[in-house]
């Protein structure tokens, strides 16, 4: 009997998977893929074209986990689901649609290199072997039982592109041998060894920055991991960007400082250990592909000159002052900037539990203090630093009604003082506005430059946060007309690890997801304010921080005088839906047995929860056209993945609390 499959595929390995299924006698009822991104270098084969040529029904929905698509897939009655380099997570309900199971082909030898871009990461890390793995899909990404693996040797001269070709061939061979056995039901499964698991996140173009203090072999590995068709490794020559496409390691560095030009023919650069010959590269994003010797001539390099990369070169790092550095945005942003290698971070906050992991970094400088008290330190560091981020704010709804004057004093008055220091010393300010400034705007998508900012009556004190932020936005804009360099960014419901503390949720002073998780942890009913019908667009903190880092980088000054929404309009969900997805992942979590039974959902009125001064809004959805245009940024992380990371963080925090109390 023919096995029926629904396939989720992209990339040329997606094509390899589809061809293998057809050759093994599977019936493909439908293929789901992605529309090509015009900003991406699509060097790979087209799943869409293959399906058109083979007469296979093809779909490319934004959300394959949407109930409408779930129902359509159920109606196909598939025996199997297969994912071949599909870029979105398949939810539990979708996985359950397959009568005989759902299977994924992953580009590493699991459990090592779970996550994104494994072919790039193995090269960056200098591995000599990788491979492909066929495994059963469970709700946790890349964590299901293994059915088959095929190893691939990594040669010293392999690039990401050549390695991808090897992986494609290995995938074809593995599927050729495995798919017939899977159809017969005789392919055994082996659980993954969690003690050997490693996980790697997505890579960004900024990760290609060359740090000349590192050994030449590590830089060579970075170059080949991100060379064409990827964005490339790079460094700075004065104000010009030098992209390196090909390099080779040469023994010795003549005892010269890292980043020093040892010769121009060939173009040879001293590293922390040995040296690197830059064989081919280009000047800037639109330059010609040139040999290293010609690049040296065109860039005006001479022996003894210094190239600037991470932690090297004569030009100092950009100094970023983050006030509220221990907060959710502050600690994630600090980590991102320090990883970049071009920044020195100075921070103040009243605590440091979330930044303990950063304190050992020599480019991270922290002082415990209060911006309302330590005014001399504050003014000195505004004068000293290049970019100022005043992130200190009271930003939880219950405090808007419980302590409206404190919200005004901190969120407006204290931050106004910082803005005036920036004016006084001519410093650039990147100010955190808020999605709350849009208030009860009726536009379907909130636009930074056109949407009206609408709030409720004076007796609804919940709007004091919104109007405090809006007033500061207007003051900053007015100072901008007098020469202040600024960017306003508006986060839309960012979520992720270290969002809040469970103790904050216990007194009601936390974000919605933390409140919901606390109820699960303590076995109390999940309270849905006014039924939880309010919709928000939730944004993964990694996506949000990447956009914010690009604002700080401010390439070509394009963010000066701009307002930028940072949110994920594709991740719209009601609070009830958020709670339901949390519950599903909670019940499937490995730590589930450590917590009490689920106590159900309970609907409560907003007045009883927040007090008389509260007023809610039905939806809050951003337009992100400005972010796309100014930052070349697009959020990519799905809500299910963000919920999973956030839940996992708080469950482990709850166990740590329990151990500390024992």
UniProtKB/Swiss-Prot annotation:
Site (Transition state stabilizer) location in chain: 104
Source superkingdom: Bacteria
Native organism taxonomy: Bacteria, Pseudomonadati, Pseudomonadota, Gammaproteobacteria, Pseudomonadales
Segments for region (Dehydrogenase ArnADH): 316-662
Binding sites annotated in the UniProt record for (6R)-10-formyltetrahydrofolate: 116, 138-142
EC number annotated for this UniProt entry: 2.1.2.13, 1.1.1.305
PANTHER family: BIFUNCTIONAL POLYMYXIN RESISTANCE PROTEIN ARNA, UDP-D-APIOSE_UDP-D-XYLOSE SYNTHASE 2
Protein name (record): Bifunctional polymyxin resistance protein ArnA
Gene from which the chain derives: arnA
Pathway: Nucleotide-sugar biosynthesis; UDP-4-deoxy-4-formamido-beta-L-arabinose biosynthesis; UDP-4-deoxy-4-formamido-beta-L-arabinose from UDP-alpha-D-glucuronate: step 1/3; Nucleotide-sugar biosynthesis; UDP-4-deoxy-4-formamido-beta-L-arabinose biosynthesis; UDP-4-deoxy-4-formamido-beta-L-arabinose from UDP-alpha-D-glucuronate: step 3/3; Bacterial outer membrane biogenesis; lipopolysaccharide biosynthesis
Region span, Formyltransferase ArnAFT: 1-307
Alphabetical list of NCBIfam families matching this protein: PRK06988.1 (NF005414), PRK08125.1 (NF005998), PRK11908.1 (NF008872)
Site entry (Raises pKa of active site His), positions: 142
Alphabetical list of InterPro entries matching this protein: Arna-like_SDR_e, Bifun_polymyxin_resist_ArnA, Epimerase_deHydtase, Formyl_trans_C, Formyl_transf_N, Formyl_transf_N_sf, Formyl_transferase-like_C_sf, Lipid_A_modif_metabolic_enz
Main function: Bifunctional enzyme that catalyzes the oxidative decarboxylation of UDP-glucuronic acid (UDP-GlcUA) to UDP-4-keto-arabinose (UDP-Ara4O) and the addition of a formyl group to UDP-4-amino-4-deoxy-L-arabinose (UDP-L-Ara4N) to form UDP-L-4-formamido-arabinose (UDP-L-Ara4FN). The modified arabinose is attached to lipid A and is required for resistance to polymyxin and cationic antimicrobial peptides.
Binding-site positions, UDP-alpha-D-glucuronate: 395, 400, 434-435, 462, 493, 527-536, 614
